[in-house]
């Protein structure tokens, strides 16, 4: 696992952040899930796979899986929520999530089938195949794919998108269209549904790459969400956008407004230095070629200066 993946997993695993993602994505910002009501689950998923005619046990690892309690109208409801972190499009994500969820459901069936060995003879006969009794229910499983990227999520979000276009409609109609939930920053219409630094992440990644430095500076200069950002979130923003902002070590919170100003000033200073060096080289070339009379014009006229750069091979 890369450093960036490790940072994102640690960030999302935090109960406060995890609850915020669940409330923001599933409940549109309503605070129905509390951090203290989350319970870490084993994220190892085991399944069988045929390899060269041999049945082998395979393991897959979710990024994060937690048991979630939903508190509503004095009632508690339960669900399992997994979060998968992605920094790039994964075109097989639908199949991967479908496998994870299916394994979780089968684990529940296996657990329930072993739960009550004292069931009546009638119950044992009626459930002898699966061990799963009539009337029993499963805890819902939801997987949220959190995309830490500056572009649009371009991968399929449903099983039908993975199937050939040439399939007859009659066949497609018989195949359940398994869909996944993707949190993509550029698609977040209302960042206020998030109450933690996840909001700053969605805003920053929606602006994009370091090439959009002026937009990024404007965002962070004017948005109070960036006055105090979780240092892990700041690190994620910095890595994904490749901005090169200096994140102070051993600080829980980072003032990204100040950090981006320093970053912007350094870029300007670097650009000025490079520009001065380049122009000095141009002046030298113009003098050597007997074109010194146009030096002042090159200094005053940006269009003419660009022509001179091109003429003397500095473009």
Task: Give residue spans per PLM region.
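Elongated, amphipathic alpha-helical interaction scaffolds
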Residues: 1-315
């Amino acid at each position: 696992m890369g450093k960036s993946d490790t940072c994102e997993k640690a960030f999302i695993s935090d109960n406060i952040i995890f609850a915020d993602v669940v409330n923001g994505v599933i409940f549109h910002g309503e605070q129905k899930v509390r951090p203290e009501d989350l319970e870490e689950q084993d994220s190892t998923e085991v399944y069988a796979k045929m390899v060269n005619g041999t049945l082998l046990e395979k393991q897959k690892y979710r990024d994060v899986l937690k048991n979630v309690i939903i508190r509503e109208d004095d009632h508690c409801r339960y669900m399992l929520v997994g979060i998968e972190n992605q920094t790039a499009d994964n075109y097989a994500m639908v199949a991967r999530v479908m496998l994870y969820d299916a394994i979780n459901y089968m684990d529940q069936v296996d657990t329930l089938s072993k739960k009550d060995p004292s069931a009546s003879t009638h119950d044992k006969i009626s459930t002898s195949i699966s061990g799963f009794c009539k009337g029993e229910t499963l805890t819902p499983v939801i997987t949220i794919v959190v995309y830490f990227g500056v572009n649009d999520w371009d991968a399929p979000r449903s099983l039908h998108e993975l199937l050939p276009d040439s399939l007859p409609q009659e066949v497609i109609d018989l195949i359940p269209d398994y869909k996944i939930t993707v949190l993509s920053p550029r698609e977040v219409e209302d960042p206020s549904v998030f109450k933690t630094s996840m909001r700053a992440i969605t805003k920053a990644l929606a602006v994009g790459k370091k090439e959009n430095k002026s937009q990024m500076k404007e965002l962070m200069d004017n948005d109070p969400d960036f006055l105090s950002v979780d240092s892990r979130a700041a690190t994620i923003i910095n890595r994904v956008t490749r901005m090169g902002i200096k994140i102070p070590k051993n600080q829980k919170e980072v003032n990204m407004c100040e950090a981006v100003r320093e970053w912007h000033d350094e870029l300007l200073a670097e650009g000025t230095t490079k520009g001065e060096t380049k122009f000095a080289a141009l002046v030298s070339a113009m003098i050597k070629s007997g074109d010194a009379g146009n030096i002042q014009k090159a200094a005053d006229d940006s269009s003419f200066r660009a022509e001179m750069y091109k003429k003397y091979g500095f473009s």
